[in-house]
Amino acid sequence: FSICFGDLLFFCTATIQGEENCMELQIYHSVNEGLYLWNGTSGLLIDGLHRGREIGFSDTSEQYICMMRQGRSFFAKPNDLLFTHIHEDHYDQALVDEFQQRYPGRIVYAPGLDKDNIQPVVLEHGIARMQIEEYEVYAFTTVHDGKIYEDEPHCSYLIRWKNRWIWVSGDAILVPELADRIRTYTGQDNVWKAFVMVYQISSESGKAFLKKLVPEQICLYHLPYPEDDRCHFCNLAEQKCRQCKAEGLPVKMIESDSFIDS
C-alpha cells in the first residue's frame, strides 16, 4: 500500500474547513503555472499536467502523478482539465491521455487542441464561455508573449465561482484594454486573485493592465522548483516583485506545492 504525501495535506485542510460544506474556494499551486481550484464538490486543474524541466521549468511532480493514478486527494472527486496553451511546460500529452483513460468523460480543454470535449459558446470576438461543473469560465483569446510564439493558440481565463472572480493570465501579453474587457464581465465585483508571470510584471503594458484591473491579490506564478531553475527565474521574480511594490503593485510570489491564502 502506498500513499502520497499530498493526501495528508489535502485531508487536513478539507477536514478543518469542512469538505461537504466548504463555503470558500480553495486554490492550490503546484509548480510552473499549475493551479487547482477546489470548491468542496468539484475541482478544476489548470495547466497542471506538464513537463518543463528540459527548458528551465519543472515537470509535474511524482507526488501529483501518484495522486492522479491512485484517485486520491485532489483526484478523489470529479476534476476537469483546462490549459492556457499546449507548450510543454504547461501541457503533457501523455499525462493528459492517461487522465482521460482513468477518468473518462471529464472535460479537457485547450486552445488549438483537437481532442476538446466541450464546445465554448462565443459571446463576442475573442471571448467564449464554458460552464464546467460550478465554474463559469470565460476564455479570452490572447497573444503569447514572445515574437516566435505570437501565432500559437493561447487563452487566458476569467473564472467565476459564486462571487469569486479569478484571472489566469497564462503566458499572454497583457494590455490595459484587456482589463477593460474583463471588467465588462465582472461588473461591480473585483477580481479576487490575478495570476501573472514575471515577464508580465516586467513590462509597462502588463503593469498598466494590473493597475487598471485592480485585483484584490496579485499572485506571481510560472516558476520552477529551485533545483530546476537553471535560468534563474526565481531571482528575477524576487527582483521584479520588489520593483512592483515600489510602484504601488503588491505582487505576491506564491510558493510551489502549497495552498494560496484566501
Residue ranges and their predicted role:
Residues 28, 119-132, 151, 210-262:
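Binuclear metal-ion centers of metallo-dependent hydrolases, dominated by the metallo-beta-lactamase
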Residues 42-82, 94-97, 173-188:
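Pre-active-site segment of Zn-dependent metallo-hydrolases
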Residues 68-130:
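Active-site HxH/HxHxD metal-binding segment of metal-dependent hydrolases
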Residues 23-70, 150-171:
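Conserved beta-strand hairpin/beta-sheet module of binuclear metal-dependent hydrolase folds
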Residues 53, 86-93, 115-117, 128-130, ...:
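Active-site environment of divalent metal-dependent phosphoester hydrolases
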